[in-house]
Regions:
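Conserved PLP-enzyme active-site core in the AAT-like
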Residues: 1-70, 157
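Active-site lining segments that contact anionic ligands and/or coordinate catalytic metals
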Residues: 2-4, 26, 36, 43-48, ...
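A glycine-rich phosphate-binding loop feature that marks nucleotide/adenosyl-phosphate handling sites
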Residues: 11-17, 65-79, 117-123, 138-148
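Internal glycine-rich alpha/beta core junctions
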Residues: 44-46, 53-95, 150
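Structural signature of PLP-dependent enzymes
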Residues: 82-83, 95-123, 153-156
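Flexible, glycine-rich loop/tail regions that form catalytic "lids" or insertion modules at the edges
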Residues: 119, 124-126, 161-163
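Conserved PLP-binding catalytic core of the aspartate aminotransferase-like
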Residues: 134-165
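Conserved PLP cofactor-binding pocket of PLP-dependent enzymes
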Residues: 168-178
Length: 178
């Protein structure tokens, strides 16, 4: 009692259009846009990670903030309780626009469909590979499943060997990106 809940929204593919973190008691949520909303990351950067908070925490968000006043959106630069600026200028604005365009292009139904496909794909691959790889958790999964190389280690095969082989099977153009 009295604590707050932080959700690492590194991958929201299983939740979009299906669940509302705020309704689950989440007070703070950060979103890594590259995993869920089709934006570049790493070598393809820059990355961006918007933060959503419950109203009680909004005074502490970094500046500047986009606020809605009636039908208009404005930049708010003052906030005595704010942590201040965490990045120069307006952050990775272009990445935010790209993620927003992706969200608009899919719409609510499309986001939900993407989540349902992520759930289906993860559980499909889990079932297809569970006899060949050690499944770390033997239960239905959300957007991803976790295997270990325990079975392959008996033959001297490591996770790195498996990763390299996966790259070798990619078409030339995709292998260079990976």
């Amino acid at each position: 009692k009295g604590g707050m809940v932080y959700l690492d929204g590194a991958n929201l593919n299983a939740l979009m259009g299906i669940a509302k973190p705020g309704h689950m008691g989440v007070d703070v949520l950060h979103m890594n846009l590259h995993k869920t909303f089709s934006t570049p990351h790493g070598g393809g950067g820059p990355g961006a990670g918007p933060v959503a908070v419950k109203r009680a925490l909004s005074d502490y968000l970094p500046l500047p903030r986009v606020t809605r006043r009636g039908e208009r959106f404005e930049l708010e630069g003052n906030g005595p309780k704010s942590v201040g600026r965490v990045r120069s200028f307006f952050g990775s604005f272009g990445i935010l626009v790209r993620a927003y365009a992706y969200i608009l292009s899919l719409g609510g139904d499309g986001l939900e469909d993407a989540s349902r496909m992520a759930l289906l794909n993860a559980n499909y691959i889990r079932k297809k590979l569970e006899k060949s790889y050690h499944l770390a958790y033997n239960e239905p999964c959300m957007h991803e499943c976790i295997f270990t190389d325990r079975v392959q280690q008996r033959s001297g095969v490591t996770t790195l060997d498996i990763a390299k082989r996966l790259l070798e099977t990619l078409p030339e153009s995709q292998a260079q990106v990976a």
